[in-house]
Amino acid sequence: MSAPILTSVAWPYANGPRHIGHVAGFGVPSDVFARYQRMRGRDVLMVSGTDEHGTPLLVQAEKEGVSVQQLADTYNKQIVEDLAGLGLSYDLFTRTTTRNHYAIVQELFTTLYSNGYMVKQTTLGAISPSTGRTLPDRYIEGTCPICGAPGARGDQCDTCGNQLDPADLIDSVSKINGETPKFVETEHFLLDLPALADALGEWLESRQDWRPNVLKFSLNILKDIKPRAMTRDIDWGVPVPLEGWADNKFKKLYVWFDAVVGYLSASIEWAHRIGDPDAWKKWWTNPEAKSYYFMGKDNITFHSQIWPAEMLGYRGLGSRGGTEGKLGDLQLPTEVVSSEYLTMSGSKFSSSKGVVIYVQDFLREFGPDPLRYFIAVAGPENNDTDFTWDEFVRRNNNELANSWGNLINRTVSMAAKNFGEVPDISGLELTDDDNALLDLAEKTFDIVADNIEHSRFRAGINEAMHVVGEANAYIAAQEPWKLAKDEDQRDRLAVVLHTALQVVSDCNVLLTPYLPHAAQKVHETLGRTGEWAAMPRIDEVTDDTPVELMGVGLPEEGRTYHVITGEYSHQQAAWKRIPIEAGTTLKKPKPIFAKLDPELAETGPEWAPVVH
């Protein structure tokens, strides 16, 4: 029996709509992985939600003149619509402002505190001299004191990868208004990472099959590991569940302490919503289960250090020892899958500067398939990559429409025109060319599978598209349009078209994790019925998940919100050759993919930003 697969996907901030750079990093790769695993018959749980705490929401709410909760409600709904429209097959996409989430986060904090891994310390906190507001780490920039790189943030230098304290930055300034922050003494709880360093290091050393950049980064930050503050001077977030702190409205848990717990709380919420409250344990306390975490490279440290450290401390596995918490033996990540950045015509995506393409606009103009294809074949898997309209149009027209779409269209069209059905070739001989193409397609199942299993999504789709190219070359060489004119060649025509139809079917299986919307259409074009690739749906739910753990300052009960969920177990999609059945009725097909106007290659649609 295969291991259960937990697919944990980074939580997007609910401070605005998502742009295509966001979904290139966490969205499409995770869905390709989850869909493939389901096709292998494995038990998959894919979870995420909107991250609704932290200063970015406070700042945006102030700009829009609404409360933080109103802002979160608005963008939770928008993000849910965007991600569902892209076909991301979450079992549950929820949010961090639920009663269940608060209670689970506080359970981890109190257990870490009881086990001695939360230590109280006086630190220097940054405030804005003009407003008196606390400035969070990520809203302070300056020169890195370690490597000298400009633009280092108050929590981390992206150039050298080291964690930082805001007070350590050279020539620090506020990203909000450009003023020099004032540093004052404040009391916080810090996660004692040095006490967990040996356990973290031992675990990381066992992760040799990770992407090299992720493993190297994660090991490097262990070299100078320090305690890290897990509380903040802020009035929006999860309350600190300790006497003297819980009723202090200006002390909350650090957004990244609570965000990573979201994978666990979402799994627990999902279990309650399906009516099996203990179902989550199959993926979380089962040593045989495997867990994969998908995110952009700027979030590696929170998933390869902070979250594993929280789980180790919760289980009492650091140098201070301790007692395992009520939720049990939480299992560490199997792999942290990080993507690099997607830029636009050489510029970093920036909503404030207007250099942005929102998912909602893209879906409205082009639908999900072209975006999913571009991200899969040209996305930022191992290095930063650039989105240009020229490259997008070229990929869509030459590869998606002309190569894959044309193979489907001409194969089914010729079979429908000449036979009206899948031709029967029983008793007929296949040539070496026929067998070579069929063998290539069948062998490619294992090749693509190995690539997806090891998070090499670009290599996987390239292998599938190689078969598409070989199938087009086969049709060009066999010239079925000429065979159709010679009655003596009718048997040969049947073999050629049957072979081509089988390979179209094979390619559709190979491409289903990448292009599920198109895969359903191809399934039907081949004369098949039923649901091949299941799609997510949006539900409006009530915040009524039973809170079985003690919690303080929980959100109001009974609020409604939108989630993404779905029923994926009944889909027909399976990772194997599905034999073409002779006699299946075929009709003249409709184009699966639209060719785009070449003029779009210049600057994109009218609504698109112009980047010089």
Swiss-Prot record:
Lineage top rank: taxon: Bacteria
The keyword Ligase belongs to this UniProt entry's keyword annotation: yes
Annotated residues for binding of Zn(2+): 144, 147, 157, 160
Localisation per UniProt entry: Cytoplasm
GO cellular-component term (any): cytosol
EC number(s) from the headed UniProt entry: 6.1.1.10
Positions of short motif 'KMSKS' region: 348-352
UniProt keyword Zinc present: yes
Main location, first listed in the record: cytoplasm
Family per similarity comment: Belongs to the class-I aminoacyl-tRNA synthetase family. MetG type 1 subfamily.
Record's subunit section: Monomer.
Protein name: Methionine--tRNA ligase
Species whose genome carries this gene: Corynebacterium kroppenstedtii (strain DSM 44385 / JCM 11950 / CIP 105744 / CCUG 35717)
